[in-house]
Amino acid sequence: MCGIVGIVSQSPVNQSIYDALTLLQHRGQDAAGIVTVDDENRFRLRKANGLVSDVFEQVHMLRLQGNAGIGHVRYPTAGSSSVSEAQPFYVNSPYGLTLVHNGNLTNSSELKEKLFRRARRHVNTNSDSELLLNILANHLDHFEKYQLDPQDVFSAVKQTHQDIRGAYACIAMIIGHGMVAFRDPNGIRPLVLGKREENGKTEYMFASESIALDTVGFEFVRDVQPGEAIYVTFEGEMYAQQCADKPTLTPCIFEYVYFARPDSCIDGVSVYAARVHMGQRLGEKIAREWADVDDIDVVIPVPETSNDIALRIARVLNKPYRQGFVKNRYVGRTFIMPGQALRVSSVRRKLNTIASEFKDKNVLLVDDSIVRGTTSEQIVEMARAAGAKKIYFASAAPEIRYPNVYGIDMPTKNELIAYGRDVDEIAKLIGVDKLIFQDLDALTGSVQQENPSIQDFDCSVFTGVYVTGDITPEYLDNIAEQRNDIAKKKREKDATNLEMHNEK
């Protein structure tokens, strides 16, 4: 899962992109990068491992000159954590092209071989984002002309859609031309468009979430539609075209459960409101199914994604709502940390209990989901150590039983605590007295309350049904082998830092 930003302006964009990336930091804390186009049509790039605030110092910001640029925060699901795989990526032909990407391609191996045979293009890393950039570059190269028109750009995106499968929201810049943003035909990963008027001219911005627009003074216009491409010239002219044959909106349900900020709006859905609805429905289920609900003394969220959900549950059950955990905001989100050992060590560094809220009480803990069970088990241990008598646990998402292949680090079914287990077995493993999960129809219904036009979602982690229709058991076995923690460590050890000029 990553966050992406692109701005075409009439004034320097370095600070605006930086500010937008800080607002998308929750989508990835592994690496960050910005590339701008200066007055001499040169790319200015800075990317490195770390948080946005660590990667960009004043000297870097001063060198990132230009009125157009793109940015990225990374959480790796493919490839390694090497800085050589940080984004943006760059190719010098045709024109000079750079790209940022959020998502995951599901036919990377096939594409890499095909690209080399067809175009003699070498992809130097294991990143599917570099591969995607080269696919797009190859299609743009076919026009063999000095100046592209918007239709040429749309044609290249259309051919790219035909080649690649999976989830992808992308923003690319073409030297001497402009910026193009496009979204996969299923709309799995989010992408929004914003604009602002400056000195009588319109400036445009793309971002993974609407919150990134708000803070830098851009007005939300709309979501980029599934399969659509929007092209903005560096002079500020905007063009849009549907580039997929059969687009359909099936957004990832986990965006609303976990990834997106509550103050964002994605595909016509207020993330905050959707989470309140999740709390309403889960609270009603608890009241309906638990005979001992009166024994609950207090409702406590596992911060921060579940705060709004837990507050609504407390109101439905007519129970006190308390903040029993204090979060250290300078530790990354544990679920999206690569490596089980790092996830385990970070939980206790991230959270601390307020003992008075637990001592001698029957506590209902509320979390957005239970993935590996790492966080849940340790949180329960902390609650017991703080003096809780009984611990009930409610998950705002159903049981996660299947791997994700569209950009979330759930690569192996054996890493998922719910795989092959029922609710009682999961409860025993994480150490709670009672456990309840949200029903899938209640979860999807919570989001549809905000936008009834969304007919379906990617719910593959709950159902095992993958919306792209190309996922086989062999593919799942392959990514399990490639993406387990041992394989990740080996790639990081072998990684070589080969990249274009980086503003040190």
Curated annotation (Swiss-Prot):
Q: One Pfam family of this protein, by short name?
A: Pribosyltran
Listed A to Z, the keywords are: Glutamine amidotransferase, Glycosyltransferase, Magnesium, Metal-binding, Purine biosynthesis, Transferase
Query: Which residues are the signal sequence here?
Result: none
- What cofactor is needed? Mg(2+)
* Matches recorded under SUPFAM superfamilies: N-terminal nucleophile aminohydrolases (Ntn hydrolases), PRTase-like
Q: Which NCBIfam families match?
A: purF
Q: Its encoding gene is what? A: purF
The record describes how the cofactor is bound as: Binds 1 Mg(2+) ion per subunit.
Class of this enzyme? transferase
Q: Where is the Glutamine amidotransferase type-2 domain?
A: 2-235
Question: Active site at which residues?
Answer: C2
What this protein is called in its record is Amidophosphoribosyltransferase
Instruction: Report which superkingdom the organism of origin falls in.
Output: Bacteria
Q: Which organism is it from?
A: Pasteurella multocida (strain Pm70)
Gene3D superfamilies per record: 3.40.50.2020, Glutamine Phosphoribosylpyrophosphate, subunit 1, domain 1
Q: Which GO terms describe its biological process?
A: 'de novo' IMP biosynthetic process; purine nucleobase biosynthetic process
Q: What does this protein do?
A: Catalyzes the formation of phosphoribosylamine from phosphoribosylpyrophosphate (PRPP) and glutamine.
Gene Ontology MF term list:
amidophosphoribosyltransferase activity; magnesium ion binding
Protein family (similarity comment):
In the C-terminal section; belongs to the purine/pyrimidine phosphoribosyltransferase family.
Q: Where does Mg(2+) bind?
A: T305, D367, D368
Q: What is its EC number?
A: 2.4.2.14
* Pathway assigned in UniProt: Purine metabolism; IMP biosynthesis via de novo pathway; N(1)-(5-phospho-D-ribosyl)glycinamide from 5-phospho-alpha-D-ribose 1-diphosphate: step 1/2
> Which InterPro entries would you find in this protein's record?
GATase_2_dom (IPR017932), Ntn_hydrolases_N (IPR029055), PRibTrfase_dom (IPR000836), PRTase-like (IPR029057), PurF (IPR005854), PurF_N (IPR035584)
What is the catalytic activity of this protein? 5-phospho-beta-D-ribosylamine + L-glutamate + diphosphate = 5-phospho-alpha-D-ribose 1-diphosphate + L-glutamine + H2O
